[in-house]
Amino acid sequence: MDAVGYEVFWNETLSQIRSESTEAEFNMWFAHLFFIASFENAIEIAVPSDFFRIQFSQKYQEKLERKFLELSGHPIKLLFAVKKGTPHGNTAPPKHVHTYLEKNSPAEVPSKKSFHPDLNRDYTFENFVSGEETKFSHSAAISVSKNPGTSYNPLLIYGGVGLGKTHLMQAIGHEIYKTTDLNVIYVTAENFGNEFISTLLNKKTQDFKKKYRYTADVLLIDDIHFFENKDGLQEELFYTFNELFEKKKQIIFTCDRPVQELKNLSSRLRSRCSRGLSTDLNMPCFETRCAILIKKIQNYNSTYPHKAIHISDDVVRLVSENISSNIRDLEGALTKIIAFIEVSGSITIDIVPSLLKEFFLSARPKHITVETILHVVADHFNISYSDLKGKKRNKSVVYPRQIAMFLSKELTELSTTELGIEFGGRDHSTVIYGCQKIEGEILTNPSLQANLDLLKSKVQDSIR
């Protein structure tokens, strides 16, 4: 596409946005933009201020890029440049734009798909950094993207908060959408539920079924643990699953734990989810965390070459050593470092601990208590705090109690004698036995380690 073509479709994109927005919204956000230049697969747009650029890119950049793709058939990246005196209002397109429109009617540009997935543009395989702890899950995801509906169907990706489940799921969606003519639909479990309730109230359930049962070739649902204790939604998901599975459509779910542990999900849904492959994402190791930070710095410099940053290897290592909770915290720390560099021009290693004190575990007060662990474990296993600490010896209580003992030994500095007192006055030998039981099971049950990592993450979150 030539430069005029980019400008034409930019103006068409704004026209479409105007028709879909309120007048107040359009005048506040979109009337301040104007076309500056185009490059290969990129358009530079003028905005009135740096504050406006930050707010606008967070709220509307992906929406504009999707709309441009729908109209032109060409994917683009929007680049924003602050230009003082940006003209306001809906200015008429230049004469050369009208000429181009007459010769190249946008209506003649075929739409690539009948449905455009609402995917995060950064969640691709290219941006996913795979280490030893994610190698199997990464390989499975690539296999599904190359053979949707045939290998590993359904695919369930589970793990703790901020470990990359959504990224890996959406990377599959991006790849299938890019390389096939299949319709990819991505939705969070909560939005699936909200949409279903809305169609019930408006008596448009057929529209809902058409979208999820008949339009979808690939269905991605994030956070299916949301469906626990929601019988009506589970019923709808069950029939949607059956319809897609029988037609060999690809189904991908994410969850915060193995599906067998979703005790308030119907047994028939748990059974359906277990038909394919379940794979877990664990905490990234130190080397992987370093690689993730380096990759994100490279991506930032590629996206914003005019304000590229330099972060030394020493800073990268220091951050990676002190943030081992999840990738989301790494991203948050990097964002803060970038903001500091934009203001100060550079960053040195001696500044990092104070700058990132809320992220660094070593800088946080040690407030993890046995009581905190007991509450987290009780909530996770859906049992009462008093039962967990009490004298009950049925299996549904003893096993979570042993897990709580194991976590307490790892996350606190109490002796086994002190832990025995915390666990209702038990003997220290009971604590030792419980911890040894869990240590032994870790060797034979890989999913247990993922579950323990999830619980550790929840404990850390509870003291923030």
Curated annotation (Swiss-Prot):
SMART domains: AAA, Bac_DnaA_C. Residues 74-117 are annotated as: Domain II. One of its GO terms (biological process) is DNA replication initiation. It comes from the Bacteria. Residues 118-341 are annotated as: Domain III, AAA+ region. Pfam families: Bac_DnaA, Bac_DnaA_C, DnaA_N. Keywords: ATP-binding, Cytoplasm, DNA replication, DNA-binding, Lipid-binding, Nucleotide-binding. The keyword Cytoplasm applies. GO terms for molecular function: ATP binding; ATP hydrolysis activity; DNA replication origin binding; lipid binding. It is found in: Cytoplasm. Residues 1-74 are annotated as: Domain I, interacts with DnaA modulators. ATP binds at residues 162, 164-166. Its main location: cytoplasm. One of its GO terms (cellular component) is cytoplasm. Residues 342-464 are annotated as: Domain IV, binds dsDNA. InterPro entries: AAA+_ATPase (IPR003593), Chromosome_initiator_DnaA (IPR001957), Chromosome_initiator_DnaA-like (IPR020591), Chromosome_initiator_DnaA_CS (IPR018312), DnaA_C (IPR013159), DnaA_dom (IPR013317), DnaA_N_dom (IPR024633), DnaA_N_sf (IPR038454). The keyword Nucleotide-binding applies. Plays an essential role in the initiation and regulation of chromosomal replication. ATP-DnaA binds to the origin of replication (oriC) to initiate formation of the DNA replication initiation complex once per cell cycle. Binds the DnaA box (a 9 base pair repeat at the origin) and separates the double-stranded (ds)DNA. Forms a right-handed helical filament on oriC DNA; dsDNA binds to the exterior of the filament while single-stranded (ss)DNA is stabiized in the filament's interior. Oligomerizes as a right-handed, spiral filament on DNA at oriC. Belongs to the DnaA family. Domain I is involved in oligomerization and binding regulators, domain II is flexibile and of varying length in different bacteria, domain III forms the AAA+ region, while domain IV binds dsDNA. HAMAP family: DnaA_bact. This is Chromosomal replication initiator protein DnaA. It comes from Treponema pallidum (strain Nichols). The lineage of its organism: Bacteria, Pseudomonadati, Spirochaetota, Spirochaetia, Spirochaetales. The gene is dnaA.
